[in-house]
C-alpha cells in the first residue's frame, strides 16, 4: 500500500529525563492522539516512583496504554510488547485517532518496527538440563558446544554470559536450528506510515544534570520506601528483569547494607547516565529520524509539520 494511504503512527523516542512525556501529553491534548508507553519499567505495577511513571494528573490529561500490565515477579519480552502494541495501535486507529508510541526502550521500538524472529518459547525442563550441565562441566564447556552448532552466536556471546549462552543452546535443543538460522527470518514489518522522532538536550551535561536532579526528586518522593515495600514481598530478587531497572537495583543493594547512602545515589545516577548513553547510541544509528531539542519552543509545531 502507498505510504500516504496507510494510517499514521508516531514514534517519540529519547533518553531518560529528556521530556518525552510532556511533549506526548501536548500531542494527546491538542491533536487527537492516544499514547502507548514503550518502556520496560512502566509495565510493572507498584514501581511508580523509580520508573518516573506519569502522575495521576498526567494520566488524566493523557491516558497511557501498556503501563501497569505486569507484576514485578513476571517477565515481559520484546515479542510480548510487539503483540500488545499492535493490538493497541489497531484499537486507536479504529477510533479515528493517531497512536503515539512514547518511551526509551529501544529494543521494543526496534521489535515493533522491524518484526521479530520466530524463536521458540522458553522450556523450563531444557533450561534446567542446561544449568545442570553447566554446574557439572562449567559454562566454558557449554560455550564450546555452542561454537560447534552456532559459531556466529558463539563469537557474539561471551562464556561469562550464562543467560544468553543458555538461551542460544535452549533454542537449538528445542528447534534443531541455531539462533543464527532462525534470526534470518523475521515477522512482517508494521503496515503503517511511521513518523519517527527523537528528543534530547543538545548538550550532554544538560542531560546529566537533569538525571541527577530527577533522582534527587525521586528520593524525596519516597523511592526508598517504594523499594522497601517491594523487598518486603519476599518473592522478588535482583535477578528479575523488574529489579534490574536502573535505580531499583542500587536502592535494593543499599537497603541490603552493601554500601552507604551517598554511594547508592552516586551509583544510581551513574547507572542512569549509562542508560541514557546507550539510548543515544541506538538513536544516532536509527534511520529516518527527526530530532527535537529538549525544552525548545515550537517542538509540537515542528513535530506536527513533519507528520503532514
Swiss-Prot record:
Residues at the site labelled Interaction with substrate tRNA: 105, 127
Name the positions where ATP binds.
14-21
* Name of the top EC class for this enzyme: transferase
Per the record, the similarity remark reads: Belongs to the IPP transferase family.
Alphabetically sorted, this entry's keywords are: ATP-binding, Magnesium, Nucleotide-binding, Transferase, tRNA processing
Q: How does it assemble?
A: Monomer.
Q: Can you tell me which residues bind substrate?
A: 16-21
Question: What's the EC number here?
Answer: 2.5.1.75
Q: Its biological function? A: Catalyzes the transfer of a dimethylallyl group onto the adenine at position 37 in tRNAs that read codons beginning with uridine, leading to the formation of N6-(dimethylallyl)adenosine (i(6)A).
| Full protein name | tRNA dimethylallyltransferase
Which HAMAP family does UniProt cross-reference here?
A: IPP_trans
Which cofactor does the UniProt annotation name?
A: Mg(2+)
Q: Which residue ranges does the record annotate as region Interaction with substrate tRNA? A: 39-42, 163-167, 244-249
Q: Which GO terms describe its molecular function?
A: ATP binding; tRNA dimethylallyltransferase activity
Please state the gene responsible for encoding this protein. Answer: miaA
Pfam families xrefs: IPPT (PF01715)
A biological process term (GO) from this entry: tRNA modification
Q: What reaction does this catalyse?
A: adenosine(37) in tRNA + dimethylallyl diphosphate = N(6)-dimethylallyladenosine(37) in tRNA + diphosphate
NCBIfam families documented for this protein: miaA (TIGR00174)
Q: Does the UniProt entry include the keyword Nucleus?
A: no
